[in-house]
Structure formats: C-alpha cells, structure tokens
C-alpha cells in the first residue's frame, strides 16, 4: 500500500511540473528546438513511470490474492480435520452412552418384559461367574506348581538295624572289621561277618558230613610240645611274601602284608571264638590205588596237603573252623576205614592261621 501511495505522489508531481513548463512557454511565445526535445523526453519519462507503477500495482494485487487464497484453503483443511475428529469422538461417546444406557435399562424401563427376561438371564450367567473367576486364576497358578513338583514319598523306616549300628557299618573300614572279627565274643554273638554270601563247597554232599562238637577245653595243652612247629614257621615265613585277599562286600579287597602269628582256636558248640577267617574246606578220600590220581583244582593259591592216620575203633574228628555257618563246616568220620589217609585241600581266601593238631588218646 505504501508503494502505491508513493507512485501516485510521483505522478502528481510530474504533472504539476509539466503544467508549470507549459505556462512558462506560453508566456514566452518563442520556443526553440531544444525545448521541444526536452518536452518529448519528459513525456517518455511520464509514460515509463506510469507503466512501472501499473506493473507494480498488478503484481502486488496478484500476490495478495494468492496469499489470501492459500490461507483460506489451509484454514478450510484444518477445520475439516477438526470436524472429522469431532464427529469420531461424538460417535464414540454416543456408542458408549448407548451401551451404558442398555446396561442400566432394567432400572429405567421396568415395564418391558422382554428386556427384563434378557437382563435376568445375563445377570444369572454373569453373577455366579464373577466370584468363581478369582479362585480360578489362583488355581491356575497353583496347579502347574503342584504338577511340576510332585510330593516325594516318605522314605520307609529302616527296621533292620538301629542307628548306631548303621553308623558303625558306614564308618567301619575293612581293616577294622577284620580286626574286630578276631576279637573274643560270647557264644550268642558269634555269627559270620558276611551272612549274605554263604560259602558253598563244590564237592558232593556224599563226601561231606557234619562235625561233632568236641568237649575239650583246649585243642592243644600247654605242657605238650608242638610236633610240627617247623612246618608252621615255614608257612608263616612264606606268607610274609604273599598278599592274601580278604572277601569283602561290594567288591572290596584288602591286601594284607604281615600275617599274625599262629593262634590256637577255642571251639565251643561247633563255632570258633578266636579265629573267624573264611575258608572253604575240600575233603577227598584217597585210597592207596588212587593216590596218584588226586584231582588238583585250579586255584590261585598253593594247596597244602595234610596227612593223618587213624587207628582202628578210635575215630577222630578233624574240623577246620572258619567264618562260616554250620552247614558249610565239613568233617570226615572214619569209623570203618581207619587205615586210609585223608587229604584236606583248603581254598584260602583271606588271612588265616593254618595249623595241625595231632592228639594221641
């Protein structure tokens, strides 16, 4: 607008200047050729100013109209977007109001029987389910935990042995058990240390017979000299360089380096009270014709042969007592055949004292 005002003022000023020149020329009747040229130049200037002012005015008007049109379009788009949002919110509010009024319809319109029946059915279906839903979620949380971690069955009570005995069995080493087996015990407590593994002889039952109890207090008296002490000493010296294996439960083995000296057995009621070494006696009846054909089993140990002669009508009982039951003890009773000789072959499994008692009645 300021530019338009300036152009108008400029045109007015130029026109006034031209009027003044014309008045001066009329006053002076004589005009020269130079003045005529000046008048033409001024006219050109006037025309140029008019053209420039017209172009400026038209440009300004066009720009203003463009700005107004753009601003109006943007405002219309903004108002249209606002109207759409308002319509969406109004529709949502109307739908929520309709649902809320439908839920409260039994209180407002009690006169409609159809609405009352539908509402009563909905209340019956939703009413009892609401208190049940809370424990159902809790049950869902509890059930998988109970399924994942089943209750372990209670361990059965041990009746076989008392707690102190079980602790002794756990903490006892094979050496200590073997040493305690050699200790003196009363007759009621004497039992095999390994009752689970019974020792069975490989010989037929026809060659075996039960041993009869001997009522002698000591198998070898103190005053009588030991006849074959040298053979026993040789055996003990030889045993020092041998490693004997002791049978143990669950595959345990004990290597014994030094054997104990010879101990005299003290027998009472077919059981030994001193030595409880496990042995397997084997008895074969060998006659004079079959002495050369004695069956020699394949043992890992050396077989010891003991010979005894028996007198007529005076039977003797030679029994090797060890850590075994009564059924495993074998003896030889020579009532009728006293002239024969007997070979006793023992399969030695652990450290034991081998000795020979000869007694002349």
Curated annotation (Swiss-Prot):
This is Uncharacterized protein CXorf66 homolog. Residues 18-47 are extracellular. The keyword Disulfide bond does not apply. InterPro entries: CXorf66. Residues 144-158 have a biased composition (Low complexity). Residues 95-197 are annotated as: Disordered. Residues 69-361 are cytoplasmic. Residues 95-106 have a biased composition (Polar residues). Residues 1-17 form the signal peptide. GO terms for cellular component: membrane. The chain crosses the membrane at residues 48-68. It is found in: Membrane. The keyword Amino-acid biosynthesis does not apply. It is a single-pass type I membrane protein. It comes from Bos taurus (Bovine). Keywords: Glycoprotein, Membrane, Signal, Transmembrane, Transmembrane helix. Residues 169-185 have a biased composition (Basic residues). Glycans are attached at residue 24. It comes from the Eukaryota.
């Amino acid at each position: 607008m300021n530019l338009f005002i300036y152009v108008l003022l400029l045109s007015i000023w130029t026109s006034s200047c031209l009027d003044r020149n014309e008045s001066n020329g009329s006053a002076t009747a004589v005009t020269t050729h130079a003045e005529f040229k000046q008048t033409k130049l001024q006219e050109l200037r006037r025309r140029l100013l008019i053209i420039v002012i017209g172009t400026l005015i038209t440009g300004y008007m066009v720009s203003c109209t463009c700005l107004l049109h753009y601003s109006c379009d943007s405002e219309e788009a903004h108002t249209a977007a606002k109207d759409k949002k308002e319509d969406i919110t109004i529709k949502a509010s109307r739908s929520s109001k309709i649902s809320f009024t439908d839920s409260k319809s039994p209180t407002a319109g009690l006169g409609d029987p159809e609405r009352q029946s539908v509402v009563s059915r909905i209340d019956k279906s939703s009413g009892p389910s609401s208190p049940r839903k809370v424990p159902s979620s809790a049950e869902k949380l509890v059930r998988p935990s109970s399924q994942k971690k089943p209750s372990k069955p209670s361990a059965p009570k041990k009746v076989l042995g008392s707690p102190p005995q079980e602790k002794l069995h756990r903490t006892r080493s094979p050496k200590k058990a073997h040493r305690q087996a050699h200790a003196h015990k009363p007759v009621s407590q004497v039992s095999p240390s390994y009752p689970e593994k019974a020792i069975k002889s490989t010989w037929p039952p026809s060659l075996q017979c039960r041993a009869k109890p001997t009522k002698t207090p000591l198998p070898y008296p103190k005053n009588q000299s030991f006849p074959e002490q040298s053979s026993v000493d040789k055996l003990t010296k030889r045993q020092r360089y041998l490693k004997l294996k002791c049978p143990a439960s669950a595959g345990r083995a004990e290597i014994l380096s030094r054997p104990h000296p010879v101990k005299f057995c003290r027998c009472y009621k077919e059981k030994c009270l001193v030595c409880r070494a496990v042995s397997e006696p084997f008895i074969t009846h060998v006659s004079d014709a079959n002495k050369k054909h004695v069956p020699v089993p394949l043992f890992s140990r050396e077989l010891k042969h003991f010979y005894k002669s028996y007198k007529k009508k005076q039977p003797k009982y030679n029994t090797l007592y060890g850590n075994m039951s009564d059924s495993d003890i074998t003896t030889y009773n020579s009532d009728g055949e006293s002239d024969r000789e007997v070979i006793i072959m023992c399969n030695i499994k652990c450290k034991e004292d081998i000795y020979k008692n000869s007694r002349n009645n």
